[in-house]
């Protein structure tokens, strides 16, 4: 069972089906692209993502660009449903994504076409809007979709029990299948 959050969903989608005994995918507020789609392409498909306005680009010496969420906007953008002190720690320790990775088109064989998937995400996610999550879950024929009312992009931080429950449910269904 593979589990991924946010951009990690795009990475997980492109794991080769023959890479091992993968029995399912759990997308935790994650991207599930079709061939040729990128995370940024998907983020713009439906209204509600304000990530582009909240990202701070930092040029690297190799010519690539790291993207950070502006620390002043991190709480409202990424994790509005957790305490401000916790959000400040998360903002200070965030790891960047490269712009190149977020614009990279997905591969030709999405794993969600070959193994079952489950989705959990927040109703108020400002990075990957709930409408987009529903769209991706529908085309992936997700076995179960959980939208958590009032939850942000950091759904696994603010709602760890619900997130863990879905992961355990998915794993137990696959073990008994």
Spans of model-derived segments:
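Gly/Ala-rich beta-loop-alpha elbow adjacent to hydrolase catalytic centers
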Residues: 3-4, 8, 12
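Short, amphipathic alpha-helical "lid/cap" segments that border enzyme active or binding sites
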Residues: 160-168
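Conserved loop-alpha-helix segment in the C-terminal half of the alpha/beta-hydrolase fold
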Residues: 123-151, 157, 169
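Active-site nucleophile elbow and catalytic-triad environment of alpha/beta-hydrolase enzymes
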Residues: 92-111, 115
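Flexible "cap/lid" loop of the alpha/beta hydrolase fold
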Residues: 17-22, 26-62, 71, 98-102
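Helix-loop "lid/cap" segments that line or gate small-molecule binding pockets
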Residues: 69-81
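Short, proline-enriched alpha-helix->beta-strand connector loops that line the catalytic pocket
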Residues: 112-117, 140-143
